[in-house]
Amino acid sequence: RDAWDETLDILDAEGVPTNTVMHCFSGGPAEAKLCLDRGMFLSFSGIVTFKNAADLRDAALMCPEDRLLVETDSPYLAPPPHRGRRNEPAYTAHTAKVGAEVFGVSYEAFAAATSANFDRLFSKAAAWGPV
C-alpha cells in the first residue's frame, strides 16, 4: 500500500500489461489517476464500504465504468454489517450496493457493468457461465 512509486516505476519500465488490475485498490484520487492514466482497471474490496474510506470512494468516482471491478479479498476486509467476520464471495453484493450508491446508479446497472468488465477480463471464466 505504501509502494505506489516503486510499483508504478516498475510497470513503467517493463510496460503495463494489457488488462492490468489493481487488486484491492486502496489509494486515493491521486493514485487512482496514476493507475487510470496507464489504462489499468481498479478493483474495490469491502474497504470502500468503511465509514472512514471517503478518499477511496472519491477515487472510485474517478474510475470509468468500463474499468471498474468489485471483489471480496476473502477472507479479509468484510464489509459492514459483516465486519470482523470471515469475508466470503456472497458479501460482494454488499460492496456493489455501496458502489451503486457512490455512483448514483441502480444496483442492477452497477452489477451489470462490473460483471461485464469481469467477463471481458476473464473470458475463460466467463465462458463457464454464472456460478
Regions found by a protein language model. Give the residues of each.
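Mid-to-C-terminal alpha-helical segments outside catalytic/metal-binding sites
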Residues: 91-131
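Residue-level signal for the nucleotide or nucleotide-sugar donor/cofactor binding architecture
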Residues: 2, 51, 87-90, 105
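Conserved short-loop catalytic and cofactor-binding motifs
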Residues: 44-47, 80-83, 98
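Divalent metal-coordination and catalytic microenvironments
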Residues: 23, 35, 73, 110, ...
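Catalytic pocket-lining loop regions of alpha/beta-barrel enzymes
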Residues: 1-70, 126-131
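Short acidic/histidine-rich active-site segments
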Residues: 66-88
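Residue-level "edge-of-site" marker
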Residues: 48, 73, 113
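Short, active-site-adjacent cap segments at secondary-structure transitions
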Residues: 3-5, 77, 118
